[in-house]
């Protein structure tokens, strides 16, 4: 349908977190430490992986990638949210809104793909230990990492294009604390059914395929672990995988709640989105370091000023 006298929207107003008027200062004081911990925790893991030669393995290569994307994912939405909680402008330009939506889904989908690759890495290490160095050589690791970036870029480009090729002529108040598909589409001045269906299918398909591949890897891993005769060997193998499984559960729960509900609950979606944007990226460093002796040793050496070390 052709739209006449369309006054194109050049900026949006982020209405923020619903039902929190008057609590902005409290929320700022609450959220700022979460964001700071996310940055410090993920930088610490990245420095540990780079500086410790013991951690120059495929598993830690992908963990370092995950730390970078966790910092980026949280930084896409949190700084703007913290600014408006401080009483600064809630305005976001059209171009910045497009960028925010693109990078949110770009980094978020990369994490899904990366969890899948990390599950395959654990499968190769536990089920094929003798061939592990061949299966996961440096070229394959780099190819898998680049593959996750390219897939994430394609996935996000589709979602962003579908959302912003629609005309936005009237209301510009986004009932959310950042630009995301469920909050932006209701403002469009045209039929959004196609964009909604494709977005639902795209997010659902990516999540489902990644989840099934992870499930397949861990089914094979479980069968392999149960065949280990040594109790100590079984415990060590399960311990290696448990951190990854906890991180996967933390990542997939919010995706299902926010994007794959037949009738979304806006308030529930906002709460879960905050947990996904703030708490999830902060938890990953804790999940991986608290259960990982090698990372803890590397961090202790860095803290004691033993920086880049070649460890025997």
Swiss-Prot record:
Glycosylation (residues): 5
Cell compartments where the protein resides: Cell membrane
Extracellular compartment spans: 1-26, 79-97, 161-197, 261-266
CDD domains, alphabetized: 7tmA_OR10D-like (cd15228)
A GO MF label: G protein-coupled receptor activity
Keyword vocabulary terms for this entry: Cell membrane, Disulfide bond, G-protein coupled receptor, Glycoprotein, Membrane, Olfaction, Receptor, Sensory transduction, Transducer, Transmembrane, Transmembrane helix
DNA-binding as UniProt keyword: no
Listed transmembrane segments: 27-47, 58-78, 98-118, 140-160, 198-218, 240-260, 267-287
Name of protein: Olfactory receptor 10D3
GO biological process: G protein-coupled receptor signaling pathway; sensory perception of smell
InterPro entries xrefs: GPCR_Rhodpsn, GPCR_Rhodpsn_7TM, Olfact_rcpt
Cytoplasmic topological domain: 48-57, 119-139, 219-239, 288-312
The keyword Disulfide bond is assigned to this record: yes
Free-text function comment from the UniProt entry: Potential odorant receptor.
Disulphide bond pairs: 97-179
SUPFAM superfamilies, per database record: Family A G protein-coupled receptor-like (SSF81321)
Topology relative to the membrane: Multi-pass membrane protein
GO cellular component entries: membrane; plasma membrane
């Amino acid at each position: 349908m052709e739209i006449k006298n369309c006054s194109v929207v050049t900026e949006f107003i982020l209405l923020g977190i619903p039902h929190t008027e008057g609590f902005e200062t409290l929320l700022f004081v609450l959220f700022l430490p979460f964001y700071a911990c996310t940055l410090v925790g993920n930088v610490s893991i990245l420095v540990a992986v780079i500086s410790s030669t013991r951690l120059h393995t495929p598993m830690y290569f992908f963990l370092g990638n995950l730390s970078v994307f966790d910092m980026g994912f949280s930084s896409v939405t949190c700084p703007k949210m913290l600014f408006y909680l401080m009483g600064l402008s809630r305005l976001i330009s059209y171009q910045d809104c497009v960028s925010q939506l693109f990078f949110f889904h770009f980094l978020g989908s990369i994490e899904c793909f990366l969890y899948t690759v990390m599950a395959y890495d654990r499968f190769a290490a536990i089920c094929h230990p003798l061939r592990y160095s061949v299966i996961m050589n440096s070229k394959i690791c780099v190819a898998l990492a680049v593959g996750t970036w390219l897939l994430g870029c394609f996935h996000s480009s589709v979602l962003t294009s579908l959302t912003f090729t629609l005309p936005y002529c009237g209301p510009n108040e986004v009932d959310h604390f950042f630009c995301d598909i469920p909050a932006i589409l209701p403002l469009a001045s045209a039929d959004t059914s196609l964009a909604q269906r494709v977005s639902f299918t795209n997010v659902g398909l990516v999540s489902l395929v990644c989840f099934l591949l992870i499930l397949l890897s861990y089914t094979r891993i479980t069968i392999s672990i149960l065949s280990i005769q040594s109790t100590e060997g079984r415990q060590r193998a399960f311990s290696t995988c448990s951190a990854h499984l906890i991180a996967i559960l933390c990542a997939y729960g919010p995706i299902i709640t926010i994007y794959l509900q037949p009738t979304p609950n806006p308030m529930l979606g906002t709460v879960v989105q905050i947990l996904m944007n703030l708490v999830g990226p902060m938890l990953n460093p804790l999940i991986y370091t608290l259960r990982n002796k090698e990372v803890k040793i590397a961090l202790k050496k860095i803290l004691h000023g033993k920086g880049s070390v070649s460890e025997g």
